[in-house]
A protein has these predicted regions:
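Signature of extracytoplasmic/envelope-associated structural regions
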Residues: 1-196
Length: 196
């Protein structure tokens, strides 16, 4: 018989970035430690995860179906739309290193002038690799996804209008973890491991 408690709903979520090699939390309830930056509010669409595989099929003479398959590679993507405009999101969206940005402080004047951030972008900007953490939250239920090394593989269009926030749609692609570890680690609360 089904159990409604096993239905997981992503009521809210958080996403964090840090330099590659930053220590991940050791449990789903542990706080994100030093070095992790909260990327702020996300669109109500939540997070979209996609998994893909590229397989080789071995055919045998006289057989209609493949007799064996082998996975050549697996990949995943995590798409999130962020609502806040922060230096970290500008870096990820425009592929700009923090060291290539300049923050000019506000001037009280006269004349007064606001603080502003300046940077340039080029067509061949280097990718920005980062460690990525995602929490999907429903009350005390948490699914925590920890990606040791991720790159932004796709960016949605930015719309500026009076009807909506000027958001940042980013698709993150996990890359091979440093030192050969797991590319993606997960903690999921309240899921029982069934033994045969």
């Amino acid at each position: 018989m089904g159990n409604a408690d096993n239905i997981k709903i992503g009521v809210s979520g958080k996403a964090y970035v840090a330099p590659i090699g930053t220590t991940f939390p050791t449990s789903p309830s542990a706080a994100w430690g030093t070095g992790w930056i909260d990327l702020g509010y996300m669109h109500t669409d939540g997070m979209e995860e996609a998994l893909g595989e590229d397989r080789t099929e071995i055919q045998a003479w006289g057989e209609e179906a493949a007799v064996k398959t082998r996975v050549k590679n697996r990949d995943a993507t995590f798409k999130i739309t962020f609502l806040e405009t922060t230096a970290e999101l500008l870096q990820l969206y425009y592929a700009v290193q923090a060291s290539d940005m300049v923050s000019t402080p506000a001037v009280t004047g006269p004349p007064a002038a606001p603080q502003f951030l300046s940077f340039g972008t080029g067509l061949a900007s280097p990718s920005i690799e980062t460690a990525l953490g995602i929490d999907i939250i429903e009350g005390d239920e948490i699914e925590r996804i920890m990606i040791a090394r991720a790159d932004v593989s796709d960016r949605g269009n930015r719309k500026r209008s009076a009807d909506d926030a000027s958001s940042f749609e980013l698709t993150f692609k996990p890359l091979a973890a440093p030192g050969g570890g797991q590319a993606v680690q997960r903690f999921i609360t309240n899921v029982t491991l069934t033994t045969p």
